[in-house]
């Protein structure tokens, strides 16, 4: 009768075939194999007519295409009066892409499906490693990992990477893992687990693609990186701070009480960034992350939102706002990207039933004035409201300086100096300089040199108020000379 039997061939040792699987294999005339590249195939009953889909692997452009073709063919064979036996390595539902699809589609069209269990690659792999996977281990596919930019799993949990079938894939997996794990991280390659050719290699991460034993039955075991190395662990420790047995100070905090801390940490991070201090950024970005996770924990307790909903929201926004990366939209350069960004934002507001905010409406009023001015000018320029050339900006600077000179009262002077600041910010924007950072650097330079002047006066046993301007200028020039290396 029509139907599909999905049969597991086990990890590769013919002795590990289940009794049920052997009975089925011995009672049929024809078997369709996903691949002949499996040790158990040679031990199948010689009277059985074997077919395989290896040709699809040789001619297919992607694994997805190959698997879709296999699924389609197996369903077609299953509709025959005699049905079909489809045999796969290991267990039909462990690290097998085709079987779950076949079972689902067969069920949808009312086609009978029988599952014949098989020992998966997991049990002999864990035995070879001498490892009990309980209470936790992550399973991941080498192909998926090889195409990722970063590992999509927490590093404080051991990982078993399956189907590391070639040195090329191993090299790509190594590069991805190297974004999280150190090159010297100890790992183990497990080859042909459960068969007479079983081999376990203990290597460093950077060595995995140098193994001469990599093949279709190779897996990679990556031990945990260590306690406190995942975002989830960080989330847990922050939640503990807020728990009844946590920290009294953290437990009494609210969104509003943490406002100042959030602002301070942001400015400290910017200070480290402006100083080019990598160690400082490492510390300050961590402090800033603590503030974000702490606010998310408070929000979770108050039923406002969770850290996961926060991440999902920004994830969706990034994908939505980058159709030129994650979709089929073609955009010309950065200007085209920014203009499309504004269009997408406005469309989102309409879809959410919000009033039109205006191009400048999304700029926070709490921003520092220079940053706010530059953001206003950036946004206006995106829609073409800008000088055609930088010469127009330079002329405007000269004009505003003259208007400052011509101001006759405090009100006029305040307005004209504000206009001068604004056009100077525009000049910085044209020159691709961040005005806020530029002024901050100048402030730091002034502080550094003035401190030198103070120290120079102190070394002379004098106070600044006792010194003439020429004497202070001399120390100032000395400070400048030291900075230049004179």
Residue ranges and their predicted role:
Residues 1-116:
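Class I S-adenosyl-L-methionine
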Residues 2-7, 23, 30-36, 79, ...:
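Beta-strand/loop-alpha-helix module characteristic of Rossmann-like adenine-cofactor folds
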Residues 69-73, 124, 265-268:
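Well-ordered alpha-helical segments embedded in enzymatic catalytic cores
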Residues 201-280, 328-407, 453, 457-486:
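Extended low-complexity intrinsically disordered regions
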Residues 262-270, 278-300, 304, 308-316, ...:
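An amphipathic alpha-helical micro-motif enriched in hydrophobic residues
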Residues 325:
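Conserved phosphoryl-transfer catalytic core
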């Amino acid at each position: 009768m029509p139907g599909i039997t999905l049969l597991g061939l086990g990890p590769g040792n013919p002795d590990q075939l289940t009794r049920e699987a052997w009975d089925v294999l011995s009672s049929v005339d024809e078997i369709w194999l996903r691949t002949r590249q499996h040790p158990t195939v040679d031990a199948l009953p010689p009277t059985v007519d074997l077919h395989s889909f290896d040709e699809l692997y040789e001619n297919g452009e992607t694994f997805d295409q190959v698997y879709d073709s296999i699924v389609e063919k197996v369903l077609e064979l299953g509709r025959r009066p005699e049905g079909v036996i489809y045999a796969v390595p290991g267990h039909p539902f462990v690290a097998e892409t085709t079987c779950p699809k076949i079972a689902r589609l067969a069920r949808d069209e009312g086609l009978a499906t029988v599952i014949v269990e098989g020992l998966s690659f997991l049990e002999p792999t864990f035995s070879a490693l001498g490892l009990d996977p309980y209470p936790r281990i992550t399973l991941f596919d080498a192909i998926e990992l090889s195409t990722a930019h970063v590992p999509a799993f927490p590093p404080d949990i051991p990982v078993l990477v399956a189907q590391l079938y070639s040195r090329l894939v191993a090299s790509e997996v190594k590069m991805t893992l190297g974004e999280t794990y150190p090159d010297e991280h100890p790992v183990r390659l497990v080859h042909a687990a459960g068969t007479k050719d079983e081999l376990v290699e203990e290597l460093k991460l950077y060595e995995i693609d140098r193994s001469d034993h990599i093949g279709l039955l190779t897996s990679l075991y990556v031990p945990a990186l260590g306690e406190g190395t995942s975002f989830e662990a960080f989330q847990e420790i922050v939640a503990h701070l807020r728990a009844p047995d946590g920290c009294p100070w953290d437990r009494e905090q609210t969104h509003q009480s943490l406002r100042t801390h959030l602002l301070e940490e942001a400015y400290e991070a910017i200070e480290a960034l402006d100083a080019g201090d990598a160690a400082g950024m490492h510390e300050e970005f961590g402090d800033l992350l603590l503030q974000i996770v702490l606010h998310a924990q408070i929000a979770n307790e108050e039923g406002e939102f969770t850290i996961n909903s926060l991440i999902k929201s920004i994830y969706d926004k990034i994908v939505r706002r980058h159709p030129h990366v994650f979709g089929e939209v073609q955009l010309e350069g950065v200007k085209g990207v920014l203009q499309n960004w504004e269009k997408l934002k406005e469309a989102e507001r309409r879809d959410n039933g919000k009033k039109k905010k205006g191009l400048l409406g999304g700029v926070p009023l709490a921003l520092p004035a220079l940053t706010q001015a530059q953001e206003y000018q950036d946004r206006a320029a995106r829609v073409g409201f800008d000088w055609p050339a930088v010469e127009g900006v330079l002329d405007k600077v000269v004009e505003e300086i003259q208007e400052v000179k011509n101001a006759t009262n405090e009100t006029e002077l305040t307005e004209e100096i504000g206009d001068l600041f604004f056009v100077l910010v525009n000049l910085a924007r044209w020159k691709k300089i961040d005005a806020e950072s530029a002024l901050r650097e100048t402030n730091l330079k002034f502080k550094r040199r003035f401190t030198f002047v103070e120290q120079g006066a102190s070394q002379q046993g004098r106070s600044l108020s006792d010194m003439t301007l020429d004497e202070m200028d001399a120390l100032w020039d000395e400070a400048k000379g030291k900075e230049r290396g004179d």
